[in-house]
Design a protein with these regions (language model features):
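Conserved nucleotide-sugar phosphate-binding/catalytic loop shared by glycosyltransferases and other
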Residues: 4-7, 25-71
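Short amphipathic alpha-helix
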Residues: 9-23
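A nucleotide-sugar donor-handling region in carbohydrate enzymes
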Residues: 133-188
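An aromatic- and histidine-rich active-site surface loop
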Residues: 13, 39, 92-107
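A conserved, positively charged/aromatic
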Residues: 113-114, 125-137
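An amphipathic, basic-hydrophobic alpha-helix
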Residues: 61-88
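Structural motif
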Residues: 2-4, 88-91, 185
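Active-site proximal beta-strand in glycosyltransferases
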Residues: 91, 105-119
Length: 188
């Protein structure tokens, strides 16, 4: 299954690295052009497999809407050109990055996975809710500060709950508790 992986933060690279290693050679990575992400991607020889990488800018600060629009346009052009020859993408997986999911819906990518670990990222949740087909939230999600987004997601998408603490997965994935060592079968 050809997959597009979206890395917005170094922790996302570490979180999704085992899944990327078990993917296919035709997978594509969309990575934010941040110093930490670029350094981690370039220094991961032997840890992360080499994949076609699309570097995009991070839409923050003054001009963030223009940057977001350029980011979506770049992703659309690159994914279209990568899909030529009949080798279409079947899935896109993004951690807190809804812009790529919006592009994926327009391109007809059937499985669009949104993973969130931050209850207060309301703007990203709003953008992802109408375009994601599946969403993953941790079991320790605090509904008292999420402004009702968990319920809103459960009405529109297939909602999955992931066991384990967020910090364990991001900081040292090899030290996760035994009961969550196996990757969930719905992402593999």
């Amino acid at each position: 299954m050809r997959t597009c992986w979206v890395f917005d933060h170094p922790a996302h690279v570490r979180l999704l690295a085992p899944f990327l290693r078990s993917g296919t050679a035709s997978d594509v990575i969309i990575a934010t052009n941040r110093h930490e992400v670029r350094q981690l991607m370039e220094s991961s020889e032997g840890v992360l497999p080499r994949r076609q990488t699309i570097w995009v800018e991070r839409p923050v600060g003054k001009g963030r809407y223009r940057t977001a629009w350029k980011r979506m346009r770049t992703v659309r052009q690159e994914l279209k050109s990568a899909s030529k020859g009949g080798n279409r993408f079947e899935r896109i997986v993004a951690v807190g990055a809804p812009l790529e999911l919006r592009v994926a819906k327009k391109l007809g990518i059937p499985n669009r996975w949104y993973i969130s670990d931050t209850e207060i990222n309301h703007f990203a949740h709003k953008l992802a809710r109408n375009v994601a087909t599946d969403a993953i939230f941790p079991n320790h999600w605090d509904e008292s500060i999420d402004d009702g987004w968990l319920n809103k997601f459960s009405q529109k998408v297939n909602l999955h709950r992931l066991n384990g603490l967020h910090g364990h997965v991001h900081l040292q994935p090899q030290l996760r508790p035994v009961q969550v060592q196996e990757p969930p079968s719905f992402v593999v």
